[in-house]
Amino acid sequence: MNFETVIGLEVHVELNTNSKIFSPTSAHFGNEQNTNTNVIDWSFPGVLPVLNKGVVDAGIKAALALNMDIHQHMHFDRKNYFYPDNPKAYQISQFDEPIGYNGWIEVQLEDGTTKKIGIERAHLEEDAGKNTHGTDGFSYVDLNRQGVPLIEIVSEADMRSPEEAYAYLTALKEVIQYTGISDVKMEEGSMRVDANISLRPYGQEEFGTKTELKNLNSFSNVRKGLEYEVQRQAKILRSGGVIRQETRRYDEASKSTILMRVKEGAADYRYFPEPDLPLFEISDEWIEEMRTELPEFPKDRRARYVAELGLSDYDANQLTATKVTSDFFEAAVALGGDAKQVSNWLQGEVAQFLNAEGKTLEEIQLTPENLVEMIAIIEDGTISSKIAKKVFVHLAKNGGGAREYVEKAGLVQISDPEVLIPIIHQVFADNEAAIADFKSGKRNADKAFTGFLMKATKGQANPQVALKLLAQELAKLKED
């Protein structure tokens, strides 16, 4: 029997506001433990939460970007549970009226086709703290993360393969990143994914029993975990077994999913309206104000790059994969840079440098201005493409002007025949054996002189001019 895969994803995104959702404490990641806290985060008696308007702004932007309807009658709810990293013993979240609902996002699959994935809801809530278990036998609680604003985006169970889940996450990350409401860095926990997967016989409308997957710390692991679950569940069902409702985690070492706990039933969080936060309305004017702050999204940029700039679909996809790269490209083209040349540099030397250095485009000194200037001095013959790679590394590490550096470093390409011809004659004098080979008609003997000349000029000879002059001077030798 063959089975249809059914997947839904729950994605928690940390919003990049300066302060937390209900307290004025910094929401910055990476500080020493328990330094980004105050009496609200510790839930001291008598303290009251105050809603950060910037969090609602971000929620509205996310809802609009994901084609969602917006609940304009806003309130928060208490989700009751006890855990050491949750000092209040409840989480302030949204239950029956999330900020966004009934949305969708279009994703591009590997075969080039597109699919629309439904989004059930997006709700605002506070993050919990973090537990760590020490080697000394003690467990520690860090409340820096307590109260950091989250938006949880819950998809419909519309994905029918791990590939579609991967494509959905890629598209979702792009859209959220472009809105500017989060950096969506999984390695820092600002984007976290839980996956629900079940199988059912083809043609059956009722969903099968689902398994929840956790510990998915990369899109690649989401895909691998789901692929493993498809095989595991299919094997059980084909052997006549029954799928239990479980929570499992993906283990990178064994490339398998491992049981965490069996779910006997749905958790009862005893939701009720948050009494310490007032009800409020999201006005039409507020929504429209947030709409005006939305950027051009990746899909639209890709189409424009192909139609107006003449780039290939591949190049357009690569350039828009991150907003930082796309914005850099936009700025360079606006300065007069050739779109194809800028694209080639960003996908080639720049990408290789970033990978080697373990840095992002924002962390190096390259700017649209000095990249465009460097491309211009390649085009006008001031430097060769080979020397340009050296110039680029300098610009990436130190910044500054491309032309200024080239002139100071003595890297200007030699194109003047009056300078090159004497060097060619010296090359001939220094390589008598090669001259003899050439005069005797030895095959490809003339090609050796190109290398000799480039070595003599430390790579600064203009290749086109140098080859033409070499051919001219070698022809004279032959006549002699």
Curated annotation (Swiss-Prot):
This is Aspartyl/glutamyl-tRNA(Asn/Gln) amidotransferase subunit B. It catalyses: L-glutamyl-tRNA(Gln) + L-glutamine + ATP + H2O = L-glutaminyl-tRNA(Gln) + L-glutamate + ADP + phosphate + H(+); L-aspartyl-tRNA(Asn) + L-glutamine + ATP + H2O = L-asparaginyl-tRNA(Asn) + L-glutamate + ADP + phosphate + 2 H(+). It comes from the Bacteria. Belongs to the GatB/GatE family. GatB subfamily. Keywords: ATP-binding, Ligase, Nucleotide-binding, Protein biosynthesis. The gene is gatB. Pfam families: GatB_N (PF02934), GatB_Yqey (PF02637). GO terms for molecular function: asparaginyl-tRNA synthase (glutamine-hydrolyzing) activity; ATP binding; glutaminyl-tRNA synthase (glutamine-hydrolyzing) activity. It comes from Streptococcus thermophilus (strain ATCC BAA-491 / LMD-9).
